[in-house]
UniProtKB/Swiss-Prot annotation:
Origin: domain of life: Viruses
Assigned protein family: Belongs to the AB hydrolase superfamily. AB hydrolase 2 family.
Disulfide bonds: none
EC supergroup of this enzyme: hydrolase
GO MF annotations, alphabetized: hydrolase activity
Signal peptide: none
SUPFAM superfamilies listed in its UniProt record: alpha/beta-Hydrolases
Active-site residues per Swiss-Prot or TrEMBL entry: 200, 261, 292
Name of the protein described by the UniProt record: Uncharacterized hydrolase R843
Keywords, ordered alphabetically: Hydrolase
EC number: 3.-.-.-
PROSITE patterns in UniProt: LIPASE_SER (PS00120)
Length: 312
């Protein structure tokens, strides 16, 4: 294989899971004390809470928030209270976390999508990538890692059955209130508007979905873009974007990056590819002085762009 097929960004490397460090070794290695690292401690608290209750954890943040299991994988669903039991249909947003991410952490801490869903009356589903979830640590690049967890960027078809299941609310509920929530009835609440947001590794997967007919109504690739410039095989990603396009070319798409993000070239290339393929409703945003970080402050902008572009 040509060397040009792989252009690596070092911080993609994932530490080996199950190498748990003591408080002393963590402080020595990272120069921090995990007891004073609020963000890491929040991640640990969430992991311990979910680990304690297993598949039965349930919480209420302005609605019903719970885990749905599909074989050896799962996803987290949130239905706002005002959307339940009124017979109406509501749009759905699916979120894909970044490399080493965790859906429960995305739902309860990293993103503000549950609050946004409560405010704007939509359903939000948090996908879970491939790999074993472990107790979170700071990796050597400073990020919080839940293990070697990822989306199938070079072979997106391997995750597509899972994504379809999420879109159709497939799976089982295994907590003590399962008799109160019927997935078949909840699925009837879905409108025909299903949107996709991916961050980092999830953003690269989301960009790939621009070339598959899964009937998404809008797609956002945040801090990711074209995987062939972000550590994955350029030839394999080229094959994906050169597929025959069977989706509407006016689907609203946002490519969002930061001016200091190492993935900015990958995001720019993603935008150029979409324009070259005659997609007609594409926005490119480069946030000034923003590094590679989840941009919670742009969630509302993304949602409003999706909603206003597809409200008819």
């Amino acid at each position: 294989m040509d060397n040009d097929d792989y252009i690596w960004l070092d911080y993609l490397t994932v530490e080996q899971p199950n190498q748990e460090k003591t408080d002393i070794s963590v402080k020595h290695y990272y120069g921090i004390d995990i007891k004073t690292d609020k963000y890491l401690q929040n991640a640990i608290d969430i992991w311990e809470l979910i680990n304690k209750y297993g598949k039965k954890y349930f919480c209420n943040y302005g609605g019903e928030t719970f885990q749905i299991n599909i074989g050896d994988r799962f996803y987290v669903a949130h239905f706002p209270s005002q959307c339940l039991n009124n017979g109406c249909k509501y749009p759905v947003l699916i979120f894909l976390h970044g490399l080493t991410g965790y859906s429960w952490h995305s739902a309860l801490d990293k993103t503000g999508l549950i609050e946004l869903a409560n405010q704007n009356n939509f359903i939000v589903l948090f996908g879970q990538g491939n790999g074993e979830i472990t107790r979170p640590v700071r990796d050597k690049y400073g990020g919080v890692s839940f293990g070697d967890i990822y989306w199938q960027i070079e072979n997106p078809e391997l995750d597509m059955d899972y994504i379809r299941n999420v879109m159709n609310l497939q799976g089982t509920i295994e907590y003590c209130r399962q008799d109160d929530l019927n997935l078949l009835e909840l699925r009837k609440m879905f409108s025909d508007k299903i949107y996709l947001i991916g961050y980092s590794n999830g953003a690269m997967y989301s960009f790939n979905m621009c070339f598959y007919d899964l009937h998404f109504s809008g797609i956002c690739s945040m801090m990711g873009g074209y995987g062939g410039l972000a550590g994955y095989s350029n030839s394999k990603i080229s094959e994906i974007v050169d597929r025959p396009i069977n989706i509407s070319l006016d689907i609203p798409i946002i490519i969002l990056s930061g001016s200091l993000d190492e993935y900015l070239p990958a995001s720019k290339k993603a935008f150029d590819i979409l324009l070259g393929k005659n997609f007609s409703n594409v926005k490119f945003l480069s946030i000034p002085d923003r590094k590679h970080t989840y941009s919670r402050d742009f969630e509302k902008y993304i949602w409003e762009f999706f909603f206003t572009s597809t409200k008819n």
